[in-house]
């Protein structure tokens, strides 16, 4: 068999096989994966108007030189050049005027005006920019020193556009006993909440791999090395970062082999999902986004969003397909909300049942993972409905349709909260009321309590999406305070098991949304006394501390969020200090700030 050269056939693999490309990507799929120059990239073609070169009224960059015009005078040439310079200067002046208008629009930015035309839930970058606009609106001469002003943040600042460049793969097969411990850790802490693999089937392939490495090939090996990378990165080894990156490099090397993305298979979706989790740890969000797009294409090709029509399909296989689909659904929806990109799976007509709890032991040893998984599925479905029925239809739908959608989603939120399983309900009510930590929260129950904190944060963020701070300010402020209190009050319970939570934690339960609302409340001075403002500032400090602690889990992403949070806290402190020094004279305060 003649080996396929990766560099010369990357584009041809997409073109000849008529492989569907992700609409967001400017390149074909293989060129994105191989980081190559694409020959079939989407270029914007500009039609050139037909110009009569003999028309003296048409000014071009250089006058055409014909045989009949060889004796053109020097004065005529200078006249044409002068005319070109005048046109160039006029274009520059027009561009300068438009830039000045844009700058004036930024200075006069008003959040309430933006909401009327917005048809999408604000992305994380937009939320950070809103904080920056609010600082400029209320404190134009604020002497704060920003590394990057919040209003100047872009997607590239928060999510670096980079791919892995490691060339040192893990060349030796991991020792079996060590690998077995890593696999056990993965199934106990990760696969329990995000069930991608059947434990029994995975261990059968694991034993076959170590008995004869030639029998086990393909996507399972990619998943194996990615699982090893996840487990080693959470271990206590001193060289864990080096070893985990080397193991992940092996997965990345295997994925780049020609043909991996040409056919859709369930084991490939499983491998890509594991790799997405590790990419989040290394802050390789461009790669995370690309792999997520490839994962969604395979999900659509296999019709995992539909129930199996063949009655002879094995129940366990059917259940595995459901769990893989819903895991991809949660990851894709959550990352698209953070990135601000259109949903890939949210717009599908989903006809897939929720996972059954009867086959739970095949995926995990504990029951808590399945309970959390099903609860998060239902919340993610509600988030997608908010996105489609509230934001997308806000400008086009009639008032009756809009009110009907609001009532429907509000009812689903109430039903979701009432139907929580008993295992979560007892702790969920304590967290909701900001009560003291129950005495029965020992080491065994710590994971269930932490899962309740995660579910409660996800519920609060879903409510903030639904109510929208610009239309239901008081309600959202109360929800944001409760979300911050959950982290502030139960941080001591979450902290000991940081190493056991998913690397996509900040994507799934990002508390920057409540942070932004608390910050806006301090600067807007709309509601609350001075004591309440100081209490909100303390809540912001708690969230900042949480971002700092999450650096070990989410790396550069958490580090950048902590810097943004600290800049906002400095601005809020400066604002409160000026307010207290001026007293109740609001006119004097405005003159100092603006």
Swiss-Prot record:
CDD domains: fungal_TF_MHR, GAL4. Pfam families: Fungal_trans, Zn_clus. The chain crosses the membrane at residues 501-523. It comes from the Eukaryota. Residues 11-38 bind DNA. Its main location: nucleus. It is a single-pass membrane protein. One of its GO terms (molecular function) is DNA-binding transcription factor activity, RNA polymerase II-specific. It is found in: Nucleus membrane; Nucleus, Nucleolus. One of its GO terms (cellular component) is nuclear chromosome. The keyword Iron does not apply. The keyword Signal does not apply. Keywords: DNA-binding, Membrane, Metal-binding, Nucleus, Transcription, Transcription regulation, Transmembrane, Transmembrane helix, Zinc. One of its GO terms (biological process) is positive regulation of transcription by RNA polymerase II. This is Uncharacterized transcriptional regulatory protein C1773.12. It comes from Schizosaccharomyces pombe (strain 972 / ATCC 24843). The lineage of its organism: Eukaryota, Fungi, Dikarya, Ascomycota, Taphrinomycotina.
């Amino acid at each position: 068999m003649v080996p396929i050269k990766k560099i010369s056939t990357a584009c041809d693999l997409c073109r000849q096989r008529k492989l569907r490309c992700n609409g967001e990507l400017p390149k074909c799929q293989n060129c994105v994966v191989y980081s190559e120059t694409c020959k079939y990239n989407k270029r914007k073609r500009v039609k050139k108007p037909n110009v009569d070169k003999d028309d003296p009224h048409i000014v071009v960059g250089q006058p055409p030189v014909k045989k009949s015009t060889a004796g053109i005078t020097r004065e005529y040439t200078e006249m044409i050049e002068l005319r070109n310079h005048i046109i160039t200067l006029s274009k520059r002046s027009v561009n300068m005027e438009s830039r000045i208008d844009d700058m004036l629009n930024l200075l006069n930015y008003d959040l309430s005006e933006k909401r009327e035309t917005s048809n999408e839930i604000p992305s994380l970058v937009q939320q950070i920019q809103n904080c920056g606009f609010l600082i400029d609106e209320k404190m134009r001469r604020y002497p704060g020193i920003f590394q990057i002003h919040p209003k100047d943040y872009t997607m590239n600042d928060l999510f670096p556009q980079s791919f892995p460049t490691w060339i040192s793969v893990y060349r030796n097969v991991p020792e079996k006993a060590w690998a077995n411990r890593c696999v056990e850790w993965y199934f106990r802490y990760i696969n329990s909440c995000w069930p991608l693999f059947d434990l029994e089937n995975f261990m059968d392939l694991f034993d076959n791999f170590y008995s004869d490495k030639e029998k086990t090939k393909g996507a399972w090996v990619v998943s194996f090395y990615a699982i090893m990378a996840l487990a080693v990165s959470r271990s206590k080894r001193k060289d864990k970062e080096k070893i985990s990156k080397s193991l992940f490099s092996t997965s990345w090397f295997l994925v780049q082999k020609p043909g991996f993305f040409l056919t859709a298979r369930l084991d490939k979706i499983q491998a890509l999902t594991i790799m997405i989790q590790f990419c989040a740890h290394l802050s390789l969000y461009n790669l995370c986004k690309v792999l997520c797009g490839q994962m969604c294409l395979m999900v659509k090709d296999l019709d995992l969003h539909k129930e199996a029509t063949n009655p002879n399909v094995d129940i366990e296989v059917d259940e595995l397909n459901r769990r893989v689909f819903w895991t991809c659904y949660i990851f894709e929806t959550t990352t698209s909300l953070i990135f601000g990109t259109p949903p890939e799976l949210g717009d599908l007509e989903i006809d897939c049942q929720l996972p059954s709890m009867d086959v739970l032991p095949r995926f995990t040893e504990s029951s808590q993972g399945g309970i959390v998984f099903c609860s998060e599925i239902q919340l993610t479905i509600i988030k997608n409905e908010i996105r489609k029925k509230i934001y997308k239809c806000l400008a086009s739908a009639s008032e009756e349709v809009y009110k009907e959608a609001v009532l429907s989603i509000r009812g689903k939120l109430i039903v979701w909260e009432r139907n929580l399983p008993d295992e979560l309900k007892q702790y969920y009510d304590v967290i909701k009321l900001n009560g003291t930590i129950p005495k029965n929260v020992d080491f065994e129950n710590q994971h269930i309590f932490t899962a309740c904190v995660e579910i409660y944060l996800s519920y609060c963020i879903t409510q903030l999406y639904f109510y929208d701070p610009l239309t239901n300010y008081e309600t959202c402020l109360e929800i944001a305070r409760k979300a911050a209190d959950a982290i502030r009050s139960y941080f001591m319970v979450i902290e000991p098991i940081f190493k056991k939570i998913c690397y996509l934690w900040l994507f799934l339960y990002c508390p920057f949304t409540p942070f932004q609302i608390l910050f806006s409340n301090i600067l807007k001075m709309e509601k609350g006394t001075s004591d309440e403002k100081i209490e909100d500032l303390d809540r912001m400090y708690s969230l900042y501390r949480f971002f700092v602690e999450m650096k070990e889990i989410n790396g550069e992403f958490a580090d950048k969020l902590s810097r943004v949070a600290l800049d906002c806290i400095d601005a809020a402190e400066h604002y409160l200090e000026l307010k207290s020094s001026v007293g109740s004279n609001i006119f004097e305060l405005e003159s100092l700030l603006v």
